C-alpha cells in the first residue's frame, strides 16, 4: 500500500447507532496489531434506498502509523517536552546540594529532598489518574496539556519567591509535579496511537529525552546557582521552558477521531488475571525502591570525597548521556524478537553489579564516572521496558496504555520512599572515607544493589530456571 493510502473510519450521523467492527489500516497489512475503529455494517450503501432509521454515513480518513509528518511531529514534540519538563527535576541533585548550603533552609534541611521527591512523585503516582482523564475525555487531551503546562511553569516562578523549605515543597515540588503529570499522559496516549510496530523505539526515544538535557542542564543550573542564587535561577528556568515549549503545543494531535478514542478507552482488564503481569509488576516495584538513590545523592556522595560541585554535576551529566544510549538501545531491542524477560534481567543484573562495586568502592572521580555510565545505561534502560512488558501481557493497544500507567505508578513507590528511607539510612551514620561507601552511604548503596538484584531474580524465578531465549 502506498504512503498516501489511508483507512476510512465511518460514523453514523444519528447518535443512537454505534455499531462496531474491527478495521484494519495500512499498518495492519504489514503484520502490525489491529486498532479497533467505529465503523458501519459491512453491507454496501445503496443511494437509491431510503432507510428511515439510518442516515447517510460520512467518512474520515486516518493517516498511516509509524511514518508520516504527523507521526514524527507528535513524537518530536513529545521528545522536546519530556526533555525539558522531565529533565529539570532529574537535575534536582544539583539544587539539593545548593539548598543545603542556604542559611534560611538549614533548620529544615532534612526535608529538602522532599522537594525533588514530589516533583517526580506526582508523575509516578498520578499517572493512572492522568491517564484516566486522557481516555475518559479524549476531546480535551490538548486542553489537559495546556493546563499542565501552565501549572508547571507557575510552580517554578512561585518557587523563586519563597524563602522556606515548605514553600519549595509546595511550588517546585507539588505544583510543578502536578503540572507535569497532567502534561505527560495525553502525550503518551497520542504517541501510542501514532506508533504501533515501532512503539518500543518511539517510547525509548521519549524516555531518553530527559537524559539528553540531563547531559547539559546540570552544568547550566550549577553555574546559575553559584552566580545568581536560586531565585534568579528558577525564574530563568521558567522563562526558558515557556519560550522553548510554547511553539510546540500545536504539534500535539491525536490520530484517531474522538469517538474511536472513546472506544479504545474501553480497556480489557483481562491482563490482570495473567501471572506474568504480576511478575513484571513486582519486578518494577522492587527495582524502583532502590533506583532513585544514585540519581538524587550522587553529587552529595561525591562531595564526601572532596569532589567539587562542578565535577559532581559532571557525574550527573555522564549518567544522563548513558541514559540516552541505554533507553534508546533497549527500546529498539524491545521491538525485535529478543525476549522481554532477557532484556529485563540484563538491565537489573548490570545495575546491581555496578552498585555493589563501582559505587560502593569509589573514592575518586574515575570510579564514580564508570558507575555513572554503567548504571545510567542499564538501570534507566529497564524503565524503557514498561512498553515491552505491556505488549508481552496483551496485544490490545489500549491495554498497553493502561499497563504503562500502572508500571509507572509502581515505580513511583520507590520515588516516594527516597526521602524517608534516606533519612533513616543516613542519619545515624558518620562519614568515614576509608570504609565501604564512606560508611555514611553504605546502607543506601547496598539497598540500590539488592533491589536491582531481586528484580532480576523475580523474573528468573518465574521462568523456573529455563533458558530465557526459549
Question: Locations of the language-model features?
Answer:
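Helix-to-loop junctions at the C-terminal end of transmembrane segments
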Residues: 123-140, 326-339, 358, 426-427
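Extracytoplasmic gate region of multi-pass secondary transporters
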Residues: 84-99, 273-332, 337, 341, ...
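Intrinsically disordered, low-complexity terminal tails of fungal membrane proteins
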Residues: 1-68, 254, 465-470
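Intracellular juxtamembrane helix-capping segments at the cytosolic ends
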Residues: 92, 99, 173, 180-195, ...
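Hydrophobic core of transmembrane alpha-helices in multi-pass small-molecule transporters
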Residues: 77-79, 83, 152-156, 165-186, ...
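C-terminal transmembrane helical hairpin of 12-TM major facilitator-type secondary transporters
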Residues: 320-323, 327, 336-389, 405-408
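Conserved MFS/SLC helix-loop-helix module at the cytosolic interface between two early adjacent transmembrane helices
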Residues: 125-167
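A late C-terminal transmembrane helix in Major Facilitator Superfamily
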Residues: 394-438, 448
Amino acid at each position: 500500500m502506498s504512503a498516501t493510502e489511508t483507512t476510512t473510519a465511518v460514523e453514523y450521523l444519528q447518535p443512537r447507532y454505534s455499531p462496531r467492527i474491527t478495521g484494519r489500516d495500512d499498518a495492519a497489512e504489514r503484520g502490525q496489531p489491529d486498532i479497533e475503529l467505529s465503523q458501519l455494517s459491512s453491507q454496501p450503501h445503496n443511494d437509491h434506498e431510503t432507510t428511515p432509521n439510518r442516515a447517510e454515513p460520512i467518512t474520515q480518513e486516518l493517516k498511516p502509523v509509524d511514518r508520516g509528518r504527523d507521526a514524527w511531529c507528535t513524537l518530536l514534540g513529545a521528545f522536546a517536552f519530556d526533555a525539558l519538563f522531565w529533565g529539570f527535576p532529574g537535575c534536582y541533585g544539583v539544587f539539593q546540594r545548593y539548598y543545603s548550603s542556604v542559611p534560611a533552609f538549614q533548620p529544615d534541611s532534612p526535608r529538602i529532598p522532599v522537594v525533588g521527591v514530589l516533583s517526580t512523585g506526582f508523575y509516578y503516582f498520578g499517572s493512572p489518574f492522568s491517564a484516566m482523564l486522557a481516555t475518559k475525555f479524549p476531546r480535551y487531551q490538548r486542553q489537559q496539556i495546556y493546563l499542565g503546562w501552565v501549572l508547571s511553569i507557575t510552580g517554578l516562578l512561585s518557587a523563586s519567591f519563597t524563602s522556606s523549605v515548605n514553600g519549595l515543597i509546595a511550588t517546585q515540588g507539588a505544583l510543578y509535579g502536578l503540572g507535569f503529570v497532567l502534561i505527560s499522559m495525553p502525550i503518551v496516549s497520542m504517541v501510542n496511537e501514532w506508533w504501533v510496530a515501532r512503539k518500543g523505539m518511539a517510547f525509548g526515544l521519549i524516555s531518553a529525552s530527559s537524559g539528553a538535557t540531563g547531559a547539559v542542564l546540570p552544568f547550566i543550573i550549577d553555574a546559575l546557582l553559584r552566580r545568581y542564587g536560586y531565585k534568579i535561577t528558577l525564574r530563568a528556568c521558567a522563562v526558558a521552558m515557556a519560550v522553548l515549549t510554547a511553539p510546540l503545543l500545536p504539534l500535539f494531535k491525536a490520530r484517531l477521531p474522538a469517538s474511536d478514542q472513546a472506544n479504545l478507552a474501553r480497556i480489557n482488564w483481562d491482563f490482570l488475571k495473567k501471572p506474568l503481569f504480576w511478575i513484571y509488576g513486582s519486578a518494577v516495584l522492587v527495582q524502583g525502591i532502590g533506583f532513585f538513590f544514585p540519581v538524587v545523592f550522587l553529587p552529595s556522595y561525591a562531595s564526601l570525597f572532596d569532589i567539587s560541585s562542578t565535577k559532581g554535576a559532571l557525574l550527573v551529566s555522564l549518567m544522563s548521556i548513558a541514559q540516552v544510549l541505554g533507553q534508546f538501545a533497549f527500546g529498539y531491542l524491545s521491538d525485535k524478537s529478543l525476549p522481554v524477560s532477557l532484556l529485563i534481567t540484563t538491565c537489573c543484573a548490570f545495575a546491581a553489579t555496578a552498585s555493589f562495586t563501582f559505587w560502593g568502592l569509589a573514592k575518586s572521580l574515575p570510579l564514580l564516572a564508570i558507575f555513572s555510565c554503567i548504571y545510567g545505561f542499564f538501570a534507566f534502560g529497564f524503565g524503557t521496558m514498561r512498553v515491552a512488558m505491556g505488549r508481552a501481557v496483551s496485544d490490545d493497544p489500549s491495554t498497553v496504555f493502561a499497563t504503562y500507567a500502572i508500571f509507572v505508578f509502581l515505580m513511583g513507590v520507590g520515588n516516594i520512599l527516597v526521602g524517608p528511607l534516606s533519612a533513616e539510612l543516613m542519619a545515624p551514620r558518620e562519614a568515614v572515607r576509608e570504609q565501604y561507601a564512606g560508611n555514611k552511604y553504605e546502607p543506601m548503596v547496598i539497598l540500590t544493589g539488592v533491589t536491582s538484584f531481586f528484580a532480576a531474580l523475580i523474573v528468573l524465578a518465574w521462568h523456573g530456571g529455563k533458558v530465557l531465549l526459549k
